[in-house]
C-alpha cells in the first residue's frame, strides 16, 4: 500500500507539469499569433484548447527513425536523460506538493541543471550527423558560458540571505524582494535564463539557415517529444526559479486561498515576457552571444559579488554555513 501511495504522489506531481507544458505550447502560439496580427490555433476544440492533445497524438504515431550509422543505445538514452533531469529538478522547488526540502537545495539545483549538457552532447554525437554535432557543441558552449554568470548571481543571493535553502531564501523576502535591491542582477539573471534554456533571441542551437534543427535534427516521433517536453519543462522551471529567488516571499492571500495568487500571477507574467521576447527580437549572432556573457555579464556579476561581500562585511551579516 505504501508503494501505491508513492506512485500516486509521483503521478500527482508529474501530471500538472506535463499539462502545463502542453498548454504552454498553445499559449505561445496564441501570443505569437496576436503579436503578428493573426489568430492562433482556434479550430481543434473550443478556442483551440484541444490543439496540444492533437499535436501530441500526431507526433506519437510517427515512426521512430534511427540513422544507420548512429550509436543506438546513446541515441535513445539521451532524450530519456534530458527529460529525467528536467523533471528531477522540480523536486527541489518550494511548491505545494511533496518535494524535497533540503538544506543545500540550491546547490543541488545548480549541479543537476548543469548535467543536461551531457544529454545534449550525447544526442548530437550519437546521431553521427555534422549538423547534430555542431548544434550540440553550440548548445553546450552556450549553456556552460551562461551558467558561470548564473552561478555568480546565485552566490550573491546566498551570501545576501545567508542560506542555501530555497524555502528560506523565499521567506527572507517577506518585506522586500531581491529584485528591488538587486535590480541589475535581476536583469542579468533574466537574460541569462533565456540563453540557458535556448530561447529566442539566443536560440542559436536551432539556426535553421545554418544547422537545420540543431542537436535533435535526426530525432522523430517519441524521442523528439521527450526533448520537446524537457525543453518546455525547463522554461517553466526557470521562470518559477526566478520568481522564488527574486520575487519570492509569502503572499498576504495565503490564508484565504490554497495557493499564492501573487506568485502565480508573477510567474505568468514571466512566461509572457519570454514569449514576447521571441516575437519582438531577432536572433543574435553566435559571436555576439558569447561576447555578451564573457565581456558584459561576467564582469558585472563579479563586481556585484564583490560589492555584496563588502556590504556583508560592513553590516556584519553572518555568512551561510553548510
From Swiss-Prot:
What domain of life does the UniProt record list for this protein's source?
Answer: Eukaryota
What is this enzyme's EC?
7.1.1.2
- Subcellular location(s) per record: Mitochondrion inner membrane
Keyword Translocase listed? The answer is: yes
Q: Which GO terms describe its molecular function?
A: NADH dehydrogenase (ubiquinone) activity
Q: Which reaction does it catalyse?
A: a ubiquinone + NADH + 5 H(+)(in) = a ubiquinol + NAD(+) + 4 H(+)(out)
Q: One GO BP annotation here?
A: aerobic respiration
Membrane-spanning segments: 4-24, 73-93, 106-126, 150-170, 175-195, 224-244, 257-277, 302-322
Keywords attached to this Swiss-Prot or TrEMBL record, sorted alphabetically, are: Electron transport, Membrane, Mitochondrion, Mitochondrion inner membrane, NAD, Respiratory chain, Translocase, Transmembrane, Transmembrane helix, Transport, Ubiquinone
Q: What does this protein do?
A: Core subunit of the mitochondrial membrane respiratory chain NADH dehydrogenase (Complex I) that is believed to belong to the minimal assembly required for catalysis. Complex I functions in the transfer of electrons from NADH to the respiratory chain. The immediate electron acceptor for the enzyme is believed to be ubiquinone.
Q: Which family does the similarity line name?
A: Belongs to the complex I subunit 1 family.
Q: What is this protein called?
A: NADH-ubiquinone oxidoreductase chain 1
Originating species = Strongylocentrotus purpuratus
Amino acid at each position: 500500500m505504501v508503494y501505491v501511495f508513492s506512485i500516486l504522489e509521483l503521478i500527482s506531481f508529474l501530471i500538472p507539469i506535463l499539462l502545463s507544458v502542453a498548454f504552454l505550447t498553445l499559449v505561445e502560439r496564441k501570443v505569437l499569433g496576436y503579436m503578428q496580427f493573426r489568430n492562433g490555433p482556434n479550430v481543434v476544440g473550443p478556442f483551440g484548447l484541444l490543439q496540444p492533445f492533437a499535436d501530441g497524438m500526431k507526433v506519437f504515431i510517427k515512426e521512430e527513425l534511427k540513422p544507420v550509422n548512429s550509436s543506438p543505445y546513446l541515441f535513445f538514452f539521451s532524450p530519456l536523460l534530458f527529460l529525467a533531469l528536467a523533471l528531477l529538478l522540480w523536486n527541489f522547488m518550494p511548491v505545494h506538493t511533496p518535494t524535497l526540502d533540503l538544506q543545500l537545495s540550491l546547490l543541488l539545483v545548480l549541479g543537476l541543471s548543469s548535467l543536461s549538457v551531457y544529454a545534449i552532447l550525447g544526442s548530437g554525437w550519437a546521431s553521427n550527423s555534422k549538423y547534430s554535432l555542431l548544434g550540440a557543441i553550440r548548445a553546450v558552449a552556450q549553456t556552460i558560458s551562461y551558467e558561470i554568470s548564473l552561478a555568480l548571481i546565485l552566490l550573491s543571493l546566498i551570501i545576501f540571505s545567508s542560506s542555501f535553502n530555497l524555502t528560506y531564501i523565499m521567506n527572507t523576502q517577506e518585506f522586500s524582494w531581491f529584485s528591488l535591491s538587486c535590480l541589475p542582477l535581476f536583469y542579468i539573471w533574466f537574460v541569462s535564463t533565456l540563453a540557458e534554456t535556448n530561447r529566442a533571441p539566443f536560440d542559436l542551437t536551432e539556426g535553421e539557415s545554418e544547422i537545420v534543427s540543431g542537436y535533435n535534427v535526426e530525432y522523430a516521433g517519441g524521442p523528439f517529444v521527450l526533448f520537446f517536453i524537457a525543453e518546455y519543462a525547463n522554461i517553466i522551471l526557470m521562470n518559477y526559479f526566478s520568481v522564488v529567488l527574486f520575487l519570492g516571499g509569502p503572499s498576504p492571500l495565503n490564508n484565504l486561498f490554497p495557493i499564492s495568487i501573487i506568485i502565480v500571477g508573477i510567474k505568468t507574467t514571466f512566461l509572457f515576457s519570454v514569449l514576447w521576447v521571441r516575437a519582438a527580437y531577432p536572433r543574435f549572432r553566435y559571436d555576439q552571444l558569447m561576447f555578451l556573457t564573457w565581456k558584459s555579464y561576467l564582469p558585472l556579476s563579479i563586481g556585484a559579488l564583490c560589492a555584496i561581500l563588502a556590504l556583508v562585511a560592513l553590516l556584519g551579516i553572518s555568512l551561510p554555513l553548510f
